[in-house]
UniProtKB/Swiss-Prot annotation:
GO cellular component: axonemal A tubule inner sheath; axonemal microtubule; sperm flagellum
InterPro entries the record matches: CFAP141 (IPR029375)
Gene: Cfap141
Subcellular location: Cytoplasm, Cytoskeleton, Cilium axoneme; Cytoplasm, Cytoskeleton, Flagellum axoneme
Subunit structure: Microtubule inner protein component of sperm flagellar doublet microtubules.
Sorted UniProt keywords: Cell projection, Cilium, Cytoplasm, Cytoskeleton, Flagellum
Identification of the protein by name: Cilia- and flagella-associated protein 141
Function, in words: Microtubule inner protein (MIP) part of the dynein-decorated doublet microtubules (DMTs) in cilia axoneme, which is required for motile cilia beating.
């Protein structure tokens, strides 16, 4: 073989090796990307489940708090009505019967 052919053959071999390295890097990168994508999908699923659970807990707590506030407002309303009714009865010269213990 001549020196030119030998040089050309070595250049082709180097190009082939470089191409193989590039393809291997691309394959590894692709595998890593696919793995990362599935990992992100699983993380997103678990994050969504945690968020849903947290939202349900917050909703339950807010409903309890709303109930307490409404009960307090209703109690205050009844107390005001009782005081008003008692004043009206006092003006008429009447009173509620209260049992003493």
């Amino acid at each position: 073989m001549s020196a030119e052919k030998m040089t050309k053959l070595e250049e082709n071999l180097q190009r082939a090796v470089a191409l193989k390295k590039t393809v291997d890097r691309w394959r590894n990168f692709h595998i890593h990307c696919m793995w990362q994508t599935t990992l992100d999908q699983r993380r997103n699923l678990f994050a969504a489940l945690r968020m849903k659970d947290t939202k349900e807990q917050e909703l339950a707590l807010s409903n309890k708090q709303l109930l307490v506030v409404r009960q307090a407002a209703l109690h205050e309303l009844f107390e005001k009505e009782y005081q008003q009714y008692q004043q009206e009865l006092n003006q008429m010269g009447k009173a509620f019967y209260e049992e003493r213990l």
